[in-house]
């Protein structure tokens, strides 16, 4: 999981040079981390936070700031509040949701890019990139 997050953050840093999506005032790219820090999937949320912090340390960039918010577990109200807080804080890219149960909710936030770690393939969406490992992708890798 750390390798996926390192690759993602490195890709953003190198491709966009953090200037394209960075806040104009301070030149820093604010990336939201939407993870369940409470409820049934609390351990997953803590693991995602630690993995993201390790990835950020690995790429050693002072121009990327991770802003974590609790999405709760299966709580749409808490989920939407967390997204609004991240957007208000200046995040244009959000890592999350961690599960596929909120894929329909993120369609409302068309100007925000979501990077989901879910292993379920969502229907095509303009603002969702799914980097989870699915059964289909593993079977294709075995075939090749």
Stretch-by-stretch model annotation:
Residues 43-60, 78, 138-141:
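Short, solvent-exposed amphipathic alpha-helices that sit
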Residues 7-17:
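Bacterial N-terminal signal peptides
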Residues 26, 32-50, 69-71:
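Extracytoplasmic "Venus flytrap"
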Residues 1-5:
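Positively charged n-region of N-terminal signal peptides that target proteins for export
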Residues 93-144:
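Extracytoplasmic ligand/sensor domains, especially the bilobed periplasmic-binding protein
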């Amino acid at each position: 999981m750390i390798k996926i997050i390192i690759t993602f953050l490195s890709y953003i840093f190198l491709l966009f040079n953090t200037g394209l999506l960075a806040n104009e005032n301070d030149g820093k790219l604010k990336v939201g981390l939407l993870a369940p820090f409470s409820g049934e999937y609390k351990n997953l949320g803590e693991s995602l936070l630690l993995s993201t912090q390790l990835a950020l340390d690995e790429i050693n960039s002072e121009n990327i700031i991770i802003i974590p918010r609790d999405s709760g577990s299966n709580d749409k109200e808490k989920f939407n509040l967390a997204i609004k807080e991240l957007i208000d804080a200046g995040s244009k890219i959000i890592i999350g949701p961690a599960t596929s149960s909120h894929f329909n909710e993120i369609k409302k936030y068309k100007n925000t890019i979501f990077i989901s770690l879910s292993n379920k393939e969502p229907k095509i969406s303009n603002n969702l990139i799914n980097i989870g490992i699915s059964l289909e992708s593993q079977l294709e890798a075995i075939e090749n």
